[in-house]
């Protein structure tokens, strides 16, 4: 028997079947770095229209976690897809380097500034620590396959950036948005510093919930208001609070002007409460026998005075819109030094902003004899006992409620009035302008707009000053006596900025005021405060984007971060940009959800459900992590677990196998010489290229809309359904058995070449390592890297006007599916082994029959059977299988007649008819020794 194996065009490629990504990717990264791939891309894209994705700086502390990976991978997918779409899309990664977490780390190791080290030495240690953290995170980000200017990232602690942050503040001051005030701010007693809103987290806390009676100063005036004369005992207005420790700072009681307030007689006294809450309050304080003596509107009680239960002064009733009927009594204890609402209403009524609490959270001397020096949270019980002793406590119980805590210490924080610097939301219309700017931004998902609008509409003035060591100095001089800013503040800030640009922030602390103030130095003092770190990152649109040469003065097109950044970076950037320039710093804002485990639980070391990106890369490779990110809908929570990553690895194998099949069958194909013109190609091959064209349209649309899970789904459908289960199956016969240089085979290879050129580019933004690997095995002249080019433009399809158009092949796909069902059943019944042992007869109604007949003898190649006949639908025998999908089709199967050809495996009647090739069929003889078979359709 002759060996015909050598006459077959068997697939062959050096592209490995197994990805072995964890082993191969580091080598590719080394090549990318040695070649300066990022620089090559920049050179290739020079002069193109720009798309700038501005990197929100992660904090330079600790190792990267799965959330960081999601964020950086999403950014990288966008930057690479924009590059392929013809944009110059530079990516400059950044880090947030100042602030409390770094101070705390340095304190743990070296002690607080001023203990073992001077403040200057402490700052140097902080800078050193941040630099090591940046290096560690940078290695991991690079390992993810993220391309960017990693050699020249921006750091908020770069001297030039520090200087530009000071300049940003100067611009805001110049535009009239800064003011100073003793306002209640979030204060952490452990940090001994004010906190930004974004540094506050909420946890459940148990507090005493108390109802307290404030006795009326003028009892008769109240009786007159309620039009009653018979009242048994004193009259009091009752407040409810869960922060008894704030009562020493009480300066008023707020009531709602439009609520009805009832005078209620209880045992031995009368109390005033919101009428709608009488029943719930009576229940709470355990009173069953009570009488409502009268009611008035809250507005009637304005400015009546009530005695503080233990502080020895009286306080007014005032009117406030913040009073609700959700809980309590309808009368709100008001301490302007301990709450933003209280402060606002206190300003309106000219109340004292009393703050009896020191920075360490203990009462200042002279507050009250039993409270001086006591921690406020320990004081609750003392205050409750005091109220009981004075007969003012109506009720006390323990209550669990959501309470603001420090994001770093996880300990409860307080509102505390301290002298601070604020960016005003309203004195120069910043709130109104910001709300206007929000409307001009595209928010993805679109619910982001309502979220940030509500935050901007309701937020207080932004406290930008901090009492910290490691931060950008505010660089202000204020008059010793008046505390007014120096009249040449902007000029002086620029002078400081120039020095900081050379020597870093230490230049401010080293600065002797005389150097720039001269004789005025004795009248002014340096403000010791540093800027909130959210000011650092929030001003990067100015300190980084406006000055980096690769951005060429263009504003950022996109900011992309986790959904917690509406109140964080998106907010601070919007505030600063609008205050500086009157406009938003971004055109699009995209947010992604948080990572959770397979059961939807938050990642937590204590639960042990965290997924380490480093582990995933070391076991499965970065491309699997990237594919998981892309295939997950980032608009909600992003679930990740070993099982979910295993599914991503399965999808990866399907894509890799498709790419490998294409490469293996392009063996010996030179596009410069062997390409077949579209009009000369086999129709099925043109259909396949058309499938790629349709897929590309969908994929590019999805990339444009940032719907990466749609990209992956469409890519999978193309690989699995259109190619894997139809086209690639059909062409194996022609590809392997046709004459090597025949039009039949070269047509097929031409299609595979076009498909591979498109596929490798679709993959590149997501499966960057694998795309680079595939690129290296593709035939033909090309640039060194897939990332420097654009989407493939060589695709074409069938015209609708052709008889065998897309609709024709869609119907053929259905016919093939129906035939497969019949073959599967026959295999199960042991009637045939493989599909080539079968011959089928298709009983079709006229319209379908005409289509099937048009394929002639090539119909059997589409159906993967050795024989295929078309007959009239009405002639179908009883055992023919009726199609469920195509009503005008029945399928009958019989065992193929003739012998099996050992070369092509088809069963035919003409095996051995040619003496020189007695073992193979006539078609194979033609392909081995003759002119080769001709194919028109399939």
Swiss-Prot record:
<dbReference type="GO" id="GO:0000049">
    <property type="term" value="F:tRNA binding"/>
</dbReference>
<keyword id="KW-0547">Nucleotide-binding</keyword>
<keyword id="KW-0648">Protein biosynthesis</keyword>
<protein>
    <recommendedName>
        <fullName>Isoleucine--tRNA ligase</fullName>
        <ecNumber>6.1.1.5</ecNumber>
    </recommendedName>
</protein>
<dbReference type="InterPro" id="IPR050081">
    <property type="entry name" value="Ile-tRNA_ligase"/>
</dbReference>
<feature type="short sequence motif" description="'HIGH' region">
    <location>
        <begin position="58"/>
        <end position="68"/>
    </location>
</feature>
<dbReference type="GO" id="GO:0006428">
    <property type="term" value="P:isoleucyl-tRNA aminoacylation"/>
</dbReference>
<dbReference type="GO" id="GO:0008270">
    <property type="term" value="F:zinc ion binding"/>
</dbReference>
<feature type="binding site">
    <location>
        <position position="602"/>
    </location>
    <ligand>
        <name>ATP</name>
    </ligand>
</feature>
<keyword id="KW-0046">Antibiotic resistance</keyword>
<dbReference type="GO" id="GO:0005829">
    <property type="term" value="C:cytosol"/>
</dbReference>
<dbReference type="Pfam" id="PF08264">
    <property type="entry name" value="Anticodon_1"/>
</dbReference>
<keyword id="KW-0479">Metal-binding</keyword>
<feature type="binding site">
    <location>
        <position position="904"/>
    </location>
    <ligand>
        <name>Zn(2+)</name>
    </ligand>
</feature>
<feature type="short sequence motif" description="'KMSKS' region">
    <location>
        <begin position="602"/>
        <end position="606"/>
    </location>
</feature>
<feature type="binding site">
    <location>
        <position position="921"/>
    </location>
    <ligand>
        <name>Zn(2+)</name>
    </ligand>
</feature>
<dbReference type="InterPro" id="IPR002300">
    <property type="entry name" value="aa-tRNA-synth_Ia"/>
</dbReference>
<comment type="subunit">
    <text>Monomer.</text>
</comment>
<keyword id="KW-0963">Cytoplasm</keyword>
<keyword id="KW-0067">ATP-binding</keyword>
<feature type="binding site">
    <location>
        <position position="901"/>
    </location>
    <ligand>
        <name>Zn(2+)</name>
    </ligand>
</feature>
<feature type="binding site">
    <location>
        <position position="605"/>
    </location>
    <ligand>
        <name>ATP</name>
    </ligand>
</feature>
<comment type="function">
    <text>Catalyzes the attachment of isoleucine to tRNA(Ile). As IleRS can inadvertently accommodate and process structurally similar amino acids such as valine, to avoid such errors it has two additional distinct tRNA(Ile)-dependent editing activities. One activity is designated as 'pretransfer' editing and involves the hydrolysis of activated Val-AMP. The other activity is designated 'posttransfer' editing and involves deacylation of mischarged Val-tRNA(Ile).</text>
</comment>
<dbReference type="InterPro" id="IPR009008">
    <property type="entry name" value="Val/Leu/Ile-tRNA-synth_edit"/>
</dbReference>
<dbReference type="Pfam" id="PF06827">
    <property type="entry name" value="zf-FPG_IleRS"/>
</dbReference>
<comment type="similarity">
    <text>Belongs to the class-I aminoacyl-tRNA synthetase family. IleS type 1 subfamily.</text>
</comment>
<feature type="modified residue" description="N6-acetyllysine">
    <location>
        <position position="183"/>
    </location>
</feature>
<dbReference type="GO" id="GO:0002161">
    <property type="term" value="F:aminoacyl-tRNA deacylase activity"/>
</dbReference>
<keyword id="KW-0007">Acetylation</keyword>
<dbReference type="InterPro" id="IPR009080">
    <property type="entry name" value="tRNAsynth_Ia_anticodon-bd"/>
</dbReference>
<dbReference type="InterPro" id="IPR010663">
    <property type="entry name" value="Znf_FPG/IleRS"/>
</dbReference>
<feature type="binding site">
    <location>
        <position position="561"/>
    </location>
    <ligand>
        <name>L-isoleucyl-5'-AMP</name>
    </ligand>
</feature>
<dbReference type="InterPro" id="IPR033708">
    <property type="entry name" value="Anticodon_Ile_BEm"/>
</dbReference>
<dbReference type="Pfam" id="PF00133">
    <property type="entry name" value="tRNA-synt_1"/>
</dbReference>
<dbReference type="GO" id="GO:0046677">
    <property type="term" value="P:response to antibiotic"/>
</dbReference>
<dbReference type="InterPro" id="IPR001412">
    <property type="entry name" value="aa-tRNA-synth_I_CS"/>
</dbReference>
<keyword id="KW-0030">Aminoacyl-tRNA synthetase</keyword>
<dbReference type="InterPro" id="IPR023585">
    <property type="entry name" value="Ile-tRNA-ligase_type1"/>
</dbReference>
<dbReference type="GO" id="GO:0005524">
    <property type="term" value="F:ATP binding"/>
</dbReference>
<dbReference type="InterPro" id="IPR002301">
    <property type="entry name" value="Ile-tRNA-ligase"/>
</dbReference>
<keyword id="KW-0436">Ligase</keyword>
<feature type="binding site">
    <location>
        <position position="924"/>
    </location>
    <ligand>
        <name>Zn(2+)</name>
    </ligand>
</feature>
């Amino acid at each position: 028997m002759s060996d015909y194996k050598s006459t077959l065009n068997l697939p062959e490629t050096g592209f490995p079947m197994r990805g072995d990504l964890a082993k191969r990717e580091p080598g590719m990264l080394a090549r990318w770095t040695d070649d300066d791939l990022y620089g090559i891309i920049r050179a290739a894209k020079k002069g193109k229209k720009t798309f700038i994705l501005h990197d929100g700086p992660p904090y330079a502390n600790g190792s990267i976690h799965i959330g960081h990976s999601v964020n950086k991978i999403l950014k990288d997918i966008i930057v690479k897809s924009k590059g392929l779409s013809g944009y110059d899309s530079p990516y400059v990664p950044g880090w947030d380097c100042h602030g409390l977490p770094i101070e705390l780390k340095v304190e743990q190791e070296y002690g607080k500034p001023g203990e073992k080290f001077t403040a200057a030495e402490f700052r140097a240690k902080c800078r050193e620590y941040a630099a090591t953290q940046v290096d560690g995170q940078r290695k991991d980000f690079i390992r993810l396959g993220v391309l960017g200017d990693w050699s020249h990232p921006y750091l908020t602690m770069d001297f030039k950036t520090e200087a530009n942050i000071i300049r940003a503040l100067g611009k805001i001051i110049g535009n009239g948005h800064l003011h100073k005030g003793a306002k209640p701010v979030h204060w952490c007693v452990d940090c001994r510093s004010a906190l930004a809103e974004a540094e506050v987290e909420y946890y459940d806390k148990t507090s005493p919930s108390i109802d307290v009676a404030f006795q009326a100063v003028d009892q008769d005036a109240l009786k007159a208001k309620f039009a009653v004369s018979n009242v048994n005992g004193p009259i009091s207005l009752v407040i409810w609070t869960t922060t008894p420790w704030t009562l020493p700072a009480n300066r008023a009681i707020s009531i709602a002007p439009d609520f009805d307030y009832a005078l209620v007689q209880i045992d031995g006294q009368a109390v005033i409460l919101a009428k709608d809450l009488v029943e719930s309050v009576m229940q709470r304080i355990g009173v069953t026998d009570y009488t409502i003596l009268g009611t008035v509107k809250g507005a009637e009680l304005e400015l009546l005075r009530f005695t503080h239960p233990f502080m020895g002064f009286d306080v007014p009733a005032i009117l406030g819109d913040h009073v609700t009927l959700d809980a309590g009594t309808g009368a709100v204890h008001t301490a302007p030094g301990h709450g933003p609402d209280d402060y606002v209403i206190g300003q309106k009524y000219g109340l004292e902003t009393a703050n009896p609490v020191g920075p360490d959270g203990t009462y200042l001397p002279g507050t009250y004899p039993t409270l001086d020096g006591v921690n406020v949270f320990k004081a609750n019980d003392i205050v409750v006992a005091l109220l009981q002793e004075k007969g003012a406590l109506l009720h006390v119980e323990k209550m669990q409620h959501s309470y603001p805590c420090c994001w770093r210490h996880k300990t409860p924080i307080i509102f505390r009035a301290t002298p601070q610097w604020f960016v005003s939301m309203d004195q120069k219309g910043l709130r109104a302008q910001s709300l206007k700017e929000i409307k001009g931004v595209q928010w993805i998902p679109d619910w982001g707009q309502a979220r940030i609008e509500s935050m901007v509409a309701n937020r207080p003035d932004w406290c930008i000053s901090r009492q910290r060591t490691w931060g950008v100095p505010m660089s202000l001089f204020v008059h010793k006596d008046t505390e007014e800013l120096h009249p040449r503040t902007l000029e002086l800030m620029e002078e400081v900025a120039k020095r900081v640009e050379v020597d870093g922030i230490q230049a401010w602390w080293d600065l002797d005021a005389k150097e720039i103030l001269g004789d005025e130095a004795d009248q002014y003092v340096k403000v010791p405060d540093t800027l909130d770190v959210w000011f650092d990152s929030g001003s990067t649109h100015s300190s980084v984007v406006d000055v980096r040469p690769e951005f060429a003065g263009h504003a950022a097109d996109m900011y992309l971060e986790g959904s917690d950044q509406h109140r964080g970076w998106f907010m601070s950037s919007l505030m600063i940009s609008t205050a500086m320039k009157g406009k938003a710093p971004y055109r699009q804002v995209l947010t992604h959800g948080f990572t959770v485990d397979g059961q939807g639980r938050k990642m937590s070391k204590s639960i042990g459900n965290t997924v380490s990106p480093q582990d995933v890369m070391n076991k499965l490779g970065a491309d699997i992590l990237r594919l998981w990110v892309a295939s997950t809908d980032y608009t909600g929570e992003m679930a990740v677990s070993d099982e979910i990553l295993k599914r991503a690895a399965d999808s990866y194998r399907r894509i890799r196998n498709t790419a490998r099949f294409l490469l293996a069958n392009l063996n010996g194909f030179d596009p410069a010489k062997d390409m077949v013109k579209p009009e000369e190609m086999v129709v099925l091959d043109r259909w396949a290229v058309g499938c790629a064209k349709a897929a590309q349209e969908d994929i590019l649309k999805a990339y444009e809309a940032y719907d990466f899970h749609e990209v992956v789904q469409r890519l999978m459908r193309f690989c699995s359904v259109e190619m894997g289960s139809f086209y690639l199956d059909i062409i194996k016969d022609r590809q392997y058995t046709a004459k090597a240089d025949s039009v039949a085979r070269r047509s097929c290879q031409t299609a595979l070449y076009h498909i591979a050129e498109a596929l490798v580019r679709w993959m590149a933004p997501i499966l960057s390592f694998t795309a680079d690997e595939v690129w290296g095995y593709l035939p033909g002249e090309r640039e060194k890297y897939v990332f420097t080019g654009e989407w493939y433009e060589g695709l074409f399809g069938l015209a609708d006007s052709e008889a065998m158009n897309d609709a024709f092949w869609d119907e053929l796909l259905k016919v093939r599916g129906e035939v497969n069902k019949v073959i599967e059943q026959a295999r199960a019944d042991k009637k045939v082994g493989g599909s080539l042992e079968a011959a089928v007869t298709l009983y079709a109604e006229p319209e379908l029959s005409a289509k099937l007949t048009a394929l002639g003898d090539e119909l059997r190649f589409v159906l993967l059977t050795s024989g295929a006949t078309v007959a009239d639908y009405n002639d179908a025998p009883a055992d023919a299988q009726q199609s469920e999908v195509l009503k005008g089709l029945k399928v009958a199967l019989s065992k193929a007649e003739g012998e099996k050809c050992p070369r092509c495996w088809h069963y035919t009647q003409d095996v051995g008819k040619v003496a020189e090739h007695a073992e193979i069929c006539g078609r194979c003889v033609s392909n081995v020794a003759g002119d080769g078979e001709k194919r028109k359709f399939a």
